[in-house]
């Protein structure tokens, strides 16, 4: 079993914790709740360090997703966990029960899900790392797009030109997403080409051997 690097998690609406889970005891729960009270309400990600632990928060649309992790877990695994929890929580409660739920009222329904997502992220660090790298590359492309747009605005170029350039930059992101598929297809064709060449060489060698044994084309005589 993987090392227990994720130790506590909760989902809150505003400052009201709707569901939480941990297998441990400690003051990390009260520290996480205190940090929640001071978080900005804007959509963002936050990480605080305290006594060998990180307190990681994902704030989106009035809900806050939190996980407390040991320092050695880094940032990729905790943030990947928060993204998974956010998606699962929104699928189950988006626009419904979560909007009016009372404090800790979702523990029975969703507490076990927090545990499952914790265990999955701790058991699959390599997969989490690969996904994080892909997302980072996509974010880098988007970052370049936004940076270029800001430069255009600084130079005072016309809006119609800005629209054209934005479309071109969006196509860069699309090209990146299809790059992996194209590379796999190219490798498959190269593989087949090599196999066909090898097969042709083998057939040619067999024919040469047969002809040399039979004395040319007079085998049947």
UniProtKB/Swiss-Prot annotation:
The chain crosses the membrane at residues 197-217. PANTHER family: SNARE PROTEINS, VESICLE-ASSOCIATED MEMBRANE PROTEIN 722-RELATED. Highly expressed in stems and roots. Detected in flowers and leaves. Keywords: Cell membrane, Coiled coil, Endosome, Membrane, Protein transport, Transmembrane, Transmembrane helix, Transport. It is found in: Cell membrane; Early endosome membrane. It is a single-pass type IV membrane protein. Involved in the targeting and/or fusion of transport vesicles to their target membrane. This is Vesicle-associated membrane protein 722. Residues 130-190 form the v-SNARE coiled-coil homology domain. Residues 1-196 are cytoplasmic. Pfam families: Longin, Synaptobrevin. GO terms for biological process: protein transport; vesicle-mediated transport. One of its GO terms (cellular component) is early endosome membrane. Belongs to the synaptobrevin family. Residues 218-221 are vesicular. Its main location: membrane. Residues 10-114 form the Longin domain. It comes from the Eukaryota. SUPFAM superfamilies: SNARE fusion complex, SNARE-like. InterPro entries: Longin-like_dom_sf, Longin_dom, Synaptobrevin-like, Synaptobrevin-like_transport, V_SNARE_CC.
């Amino acid at each position: 079993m993987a090392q227990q690097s994720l130790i506590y998690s909760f989902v809150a609406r505003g400052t009201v914790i709707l569901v939480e889970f941990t297998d441990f005891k400690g003051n990390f729960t009260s520290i996480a709740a205190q940090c929640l009270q001071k978080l900005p309400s804007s959509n963002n990600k936050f990480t605080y360090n305290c006594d060998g632990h990180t307190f990681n928060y994902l704030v989106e649309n009035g809900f806050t997703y939190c996980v407390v992790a040991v320092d050695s877990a880094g940032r990729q695994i905790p943030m990947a966990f928060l993204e998974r929890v956010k998606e699962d929580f929104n699928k189950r409660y988006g626009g419904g029960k979560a909007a009016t739920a009372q404090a800790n009222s979702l523990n029975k329904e969703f507490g076990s899900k927090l545990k499952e997502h914790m265990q999955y992220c701790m058991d699959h660090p390599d997969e989490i790392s690969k996904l994080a790298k892909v997302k980072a590359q996509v974010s880098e492309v988007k970052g370049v797009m936004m940076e270029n747009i800001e430069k255009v605005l600084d130079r005072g170029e016309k809006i119609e030109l800005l629209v054209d350039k934005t479309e071109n930059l969006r196509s860069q992101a699309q090209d990146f997403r299809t790059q992996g598929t194209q590379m796999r297809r190219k490798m498959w064709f190269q593989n087949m080409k090599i196999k066909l060449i090898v097969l042709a060489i083998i057939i040619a060698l067999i024919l040469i051997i047969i002809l040399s044994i039979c004395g040319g084309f007079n085998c049947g005589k």
